Amino acid sequence: MDLTLFIFFLILLLAFANGTNDVSKAIATLVGSGIANYGTAIAWGTFWTMVGASASAFVASAMVKTFSSGFIEPGLVIPAVFAPAVLCGAILWVLFASKTGLPVSTTHALTGSLVGGGVLAFGLDGLIWSTVSKKIVLPLLLSPILSFGLSMLLHPLLAVITKRWEGLCVCIMPSHRALVTIDPQGGTRTLFQAGGIGMPVAAVPSQCDRAGLSGPTIGLDSLHWLSSGLASLARGTNDAPKIAAMLLLGGTMTTWPSPTWHILAFTGVALAMGIGSYWGGLRVTEVLAERVTKMNHAEGLSANLTTSSLVLLSGTFGLPVSTTHISSSAIIGIGLLRGISSLRWTTVRDIVLAWLITIPAAACLACAAYFLLSMALQTF
């Protein structure tokens, strides 16, 4: 098999593995707060993940550069087995974690594989350690701390707002060309209408019942859905370029030979992430939705807003972060606001251990794959 095609196959497999583990990070709050069932939430997260992964082809060139060549000393000859070994290390670890229900970071797995395989292939002097530390390790270490703190600061503010707006919704009425608010007592008030502002609309039902309204209704649940979609989109935008970059790591290509190859690579990654998300995302979603802490609607919204804002911001600067660490830290931070006893510490312990083990485990798997692939290449 042609080396480039073999690497592309492994890239698709890693994208699939990423989907099985990472789709949960943006949708677990929908299930945990009781807004959606698993099937609907996973389908929602899958769609926006694929949108984000596809869009990253046009906005994530800095991330591609970092993971394809930014940490290897220029001028080194990259062995043919290097990229396949790196991919195998990450694939094996992420699939194992998904099977056992552990939320782990594909970014950490790739980083561990790159460093482990890089040291074996080039020695300690072959890696640009300043790039590894500043552009990869530092953002990965700081992001969960920032997420933990931001969620604990953001949620009390959102809790005040949502308590004030509890039961309030906005009805969009195209036939009346109006936006109408309905309070929990059934009172109505026009936000906007062609004929006037602030006038009661008697035709609107006294209950905020979606089935009885003459137009779609927007409430707190709608904002939670939107925040989940945004977090899924951000995840796709952040993860897809790291995976696609492996095609430029030691294959027959070091740059995209044509726009067609560029689009093909990201389209393949987006589809594989979507397939993995939809058919394999249940197990890890169950862990984050039910086994860390209980959440209400406002808490779920706070966690998703924290996740989406940090992941999108990091992507703007081309900094790789772990959606896993950010979303899990946000959920844990919000759980602590309820009190220490509200967290299931055995689950938190397992999650933290999985975080700590991911980089060395992926590094060891990449080294083993490098050795076995080198032996196979010499044999055949």
PLM-predicted stretches and their roles:
Residues 127-145, 260-265, 344-360, 364:
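Structural signal for the N-terminal portions of transmembrane helices
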Residues 157-227, 341-342, 380:
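Intrinsically disordered, low-complexity non-transmembrane regions of multi-pass membrane transporters
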